[in-house]
């Protein structure tokens, strides 16, 4: 197995070109993505998405309406950027990586960032200057993550992927993988904070 690390916004285009066989990157099977790829059964659902803000101004952001006229960052080509685009009056700022987004927030280049809930919690836990805005409660539930394959599954991978997901789910291995990944992410967040 070979793992390729690339920016999120290029994943489905590279998959379509055949640069790799699957995309395993916390990707949600949205209607738009289903036009260009096929998806496995869900393997994990994160906590709901969240908006990170600076702690000293958190009381200004009780509802999504409070982001009118504010710059809100999100990762390029993600459903979180779609959510930012839906916040009336907010100015979306799209960047390639979550770390870049956090740095923009820390250095006052954006007013807020919208990321996966688990990611937001890790950064808030590691950095007392960042908190999850109360307005996050209005964002709704998280969508489940799935594995993407080329449209039409020309390599016949989905049946095996779905069988592996079912087996790992039954054996609680996915939860173990998530816990291990969260522990590693906590270390990475502490180093970057």
Enumerate the predicted regions with their spans.
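Alpha-to-beta junction loops
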Residues: 16-25, 70-71, 106-115, 119
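Hydrophobic residues within well-ordered alpha-helices
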Residues: 15-16, 67, 105-106, 147, ...
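A ligand-binding cleft/hinge motif common to bilobed small-molecule-binding domains
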Residues: 25-36, 83-85, 111-141
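A structural signal for short loop-to-beta-strand junctions that line the ligand-binding cleft
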Residues: 35-45, 49, 132-137, 145-148
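Bilobed "Venus flytrap"/periplasmic-binding protein-like clamshell domains
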Residues: 28, 46-102, 117-121
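A bilobed periplasmic-binding-protein/Venus flytrap-type ligand-binding module shared by bacterial periplasmic
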Residues: 50-60, 143-163
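Extracytoplasmic small-molecule ligand-binding "clamshell" domains
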Residues: 1-26
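Ligand-binding clefts/hinges and TM-proximal coupling segments of bilobed small-molecule sensing domains
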Residues: 79-92, 131-136, 162-193
